[in-house]
């Protein structure tokens, strides 16, 4: 794109493109985007003359077309929801485990916002069989050339022009590819039971386009009904209310509008246990008892979340413990949170992950980032609320405050490593609001939107009146933007209006917080009493003449041990002999907690302990959680003596990984250059 095109789209991205929409008020009401005109005038009064920009529109539009560019509203989506928006999907799948494909039919109910002659959707490696109106009228369509990692633009020609407020129903028959990036097909030997195959999906951020033609952008939310045909012995679950399961057919309904990335499907031979009045846990038989015990407090977490955020609106809150190859700690699919089996620590010490996914029921699922440039609006808010809710479960107010601050300090540790070691403090991906033009959302995934975003909200809370005042703001914010998608400017405008008259707002350096790389400009004054014992022990470990015993850490909580290990990662490596002695005396080698195991393995790798290389490779081969796998592989890569062995191990296991894991690890191991 030319310099003028870049300048235009960067500085007035949404208002300029919306100037093409005749029926603006209708578009605003659908997409939840308001006051674009005011924003346009504010952003451009000292930049370009309005009429010069208007004349440049044709140039920008032509360049989009020539380049096969993605859409104006979302740099990661071909779709054009400012022209027509999907409101409801009727979906059916026939599952073929042998061919590893879904045979699908979708009926899209589309509301027209502009005068249009076609509808544009996202696809990725879909075999489109036919497209027709619901009355049977065949429609012509064209699949654009594939754009690597983004798929192909599907343009569906309408038999006649459609006008604003008109509704269309378009029926599409399609098959997914065996290589669909949203799906992982597991052979029986990759499951706990070793007898039956398994299928699960991961659509976030932009992989829903590989399992159905859709507007694969979080700016669009739709309700859905689904029907899935699978072998009789299999249980089918989705991100929706399960209605009926008769023989080999299961039906679902999701009456709350969701973005495409929250569409989810899992099929396996599963069992369930009741956790509470609105919750079950699902897993393979071999894991069900451990899972039920580990997540027994789910209802307690839900009730604590409701006290802070208001009523839970998704009816049921089930958990599905997936096979180890699942790449995340959890995924907040509505009605059915997906979780990794690495949470089954046997001590409920990783309950914060469940609280995190529960909080997404409000921040992310109800109130959603408009595109993934504003991902912090999902994850930063969720981490912020997660820590408040987890702390609220502690009866003593002082201990509650200390616990919240301690977990915030753990997050700050991880943020510092991400910014200073992994990405680099000058990396544009360390900004809270990133630019995803020519950057895939999977490449932008890091701790930054989680921890920098949460830290920003904590800073605002401390500045603007404390928890009681800020809790009221949060409830107001969640209520106002419920069922909508928004961007950072809209959040900022709402906060400024809510706290108008508060003189301390003038202290906020919005530009540094939102748009500058590196660590945050301000670090809140956290209570450090829970880290004092850890820091004292760290000083002892770093002393040249000292002895160690289990008594040193006997009173530590699992998270204090994690704090200690993270501190050891952040400093110069210890001598191998001292490290081995610590592992024995502190019984770290015996831990079943994966948060402890993975950090200990990293410490050993960084100290070049050859005896632990096999353990590290076995660990990354056994489970696929990227939080663990990526840092270990990066550390192995940095150790030149074992680099080739690490690469060979990855290549041998790549066929068994989910797409997002293999995709990011290839970059970590410099295999995609």
Role assignments for model-derived ranges:
Residues 2-20, 28-32, 40, 47-315, ...:
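Acidic/His-enriched low-complexity segments
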Residues 446-453, 470, 478-487, 496-673:
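Long, ordered, helix-rich scaffold segments
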Residues 126, 257, 343-344, 605:
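Hydrophobic pocket-lining residues within nucleotide cofactor-binding pockets
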Residues 268, 387, 395, 571-572, ...:
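Short loop/turn hinge sites at secondary-structure boundaries
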């Amino acid at each position: 794109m030319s310099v003028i095109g870049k300048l235009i789209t960067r500085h007035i991205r949404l208002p300029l493109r919306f100037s093409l929409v005749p029926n603006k008020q209708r578009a605003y009401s659908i997409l939840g985007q308001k006051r674009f005109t005011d924003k346009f005038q504010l952003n451009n009064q000292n930049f370009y003359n309005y009429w010069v920009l208007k004349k440049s529109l044709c140039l920008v539009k032509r360049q989009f077309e020539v380049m096969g560019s993605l859409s104006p509203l979302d740099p990661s989506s071909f779709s054009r929801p400012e022209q027509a928006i999907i409101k409801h999907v009727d979906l059916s799948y026939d599952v073929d485990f042998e061919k590893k494909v879904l045979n699908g039919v979708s009926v899209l109910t589309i509301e027209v916002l502009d005068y249009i002659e076609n509808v544009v959707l996202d696809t990725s490696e879909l075999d489109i069989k036919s497209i027709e109106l619901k009355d049977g009228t065949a429609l012509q369509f064209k699949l654009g050339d594939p754009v690597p990692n983004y798929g192909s633009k599907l343009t569906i020609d309408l038999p006649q022009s459609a006008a604003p407020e008109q509704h269309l129903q378009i029926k599409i028959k399609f098959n997914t590819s065996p290589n669909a990036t949203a799906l992982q097909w597991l052979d029986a030997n990759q499951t706990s039971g070793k007898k039956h195959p398994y299928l699960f999906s991961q659509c976030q951020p932009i992989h829903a386009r590989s399992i159905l033609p859709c507007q694969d952008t979080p700016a669009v939310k739709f309700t859905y009904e689904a029907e899935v045909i699978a072998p009789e012995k299999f249980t089918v679950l989705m991100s929706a209310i399960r209605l009926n399961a008769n023989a080999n057919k299961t039906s679902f309904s999701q009456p709350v509008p969701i973005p495409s990335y929250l569409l989810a499907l899992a099929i396996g031979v599963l069992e369930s246990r009741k956790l509470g009045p609105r919750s079950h846990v699902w897993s393979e038989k071999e894991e069900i008892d451990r899972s039920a015990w580990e997540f027994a407090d789910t209802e307690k977490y839900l009730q604590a979340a409701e006290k802070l955020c208001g009523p839970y609106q998704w009816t049921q809150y089930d958990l599905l413990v997936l096979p180890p190859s699942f790449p995340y700690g959890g995924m907040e699919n509505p009605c059915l949170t997906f979780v990794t089996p690495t949470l089954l620590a046997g001590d409920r010490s990783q309950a914060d992950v469940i609280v995190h996914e529960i909080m997404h029921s409000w921040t992310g699922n109800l109130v959603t980032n408009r595109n993934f440039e504003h991902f912090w609006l999902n994850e930063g808010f969720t981490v912020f609320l997660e820590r408040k809710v987890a702390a609220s479960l502690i009866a003593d107010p002082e201990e509650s405050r200390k616990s919240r601050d301690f977990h915030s300090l753990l997050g700050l540790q991880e943020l510092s490593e991400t910014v200073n070691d992994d990405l680099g403090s000058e990396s544009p991906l360390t900004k809270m609001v990133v630019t995803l033009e020519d950057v895939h959302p999977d490449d932008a995934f890091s701790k930054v939107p989680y921890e920098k975003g949460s830290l920003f909200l904590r800073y605002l809370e401390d500045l603007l009146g404390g928890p009681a005042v800020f809790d009221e703001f949060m409830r107001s914010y969640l209520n106002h933007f419920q069922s909508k998608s928004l961007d950072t400017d809209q959040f900022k405008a709402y906060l400024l209006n809510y706290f108008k008259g508060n003189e301390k707002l003038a202290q906020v350096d919005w530009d540094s917080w939102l748009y500058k790389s590196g660590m945050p400009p301000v670090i809140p004054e956290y209570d450090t009493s829970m880290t004092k014992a850890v820091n004292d022990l760290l000083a002892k470990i770093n002393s040249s003449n000292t002895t160690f015993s289990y008594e040193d850490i006997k009173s530590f909580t699992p998270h204090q041990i994690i704090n200690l290990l993270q501190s050891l990662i952040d400093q110069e490596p210890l001598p191998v002999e001292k490290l081995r002695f610590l592992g024995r005396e502190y019984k770290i080698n015996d831990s079943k907690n994966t948060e402890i195991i993975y950090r200990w393995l990293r410490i050993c790798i960084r100290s070049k302990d050859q005896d632990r290389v096999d353990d590290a490779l076995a660990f990354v081969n056994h489970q696929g959680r990227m939080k663990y796998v990526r840092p270990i592989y990066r550390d192995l890569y940095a150790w030149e003596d074992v680099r080739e062995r690490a690469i060979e191990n990855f290549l041998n296991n790549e066929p068994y990984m989910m797409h997002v894991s293999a995709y990011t690890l290839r970059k970590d191991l410099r295999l995609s250059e």
